[in-house]
């Protein structure tokens, strides 16, 4: 949870390291090294929790890894792409975007505290925290600021599963058990 991986790119500055001491930033020279490290880290956890990971993060990682200049084979990628979701070969992927955009969760579980289904809107409404704002494009950020931005998004995503005595995870487990469905199908 307290790591950030970034890719060194020509013409992009390092910037100032304003990360808290307990956060480790690893800067990779090649995209292949970065992706291999991400995939290795994914194997360390039984659950991978994302916010809109089905539509962005997982497909991005999956297809970038297979680009000829990167050259990671499909067999080495721990992600399995399905028609409308991403699953894992070893573990469970929970996409919180799908969970929080479920009207029953939005209205009954969380009292309609949020009306937009973005990480920022849900985080502000439920945990009173927000994404880091910046000017310009994300690709223009110096590497340490990019690491800080990405780590904050990951932290917010985790906190959404952890607040109120792990309320969301408990709800997902109960619905999964009652519906006799895998937790990644429920989410």
Regions found by a protein language model. Name each.
Residues 2-10, 14-18, 40, 47-143, ...:
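Metal-dependent phosphoesterase core characteristic of DEDDh/y 3'-5' exonuclease domains
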Residues 30, 95, 118, 184-187:
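Secondary-structure junction/capping motif
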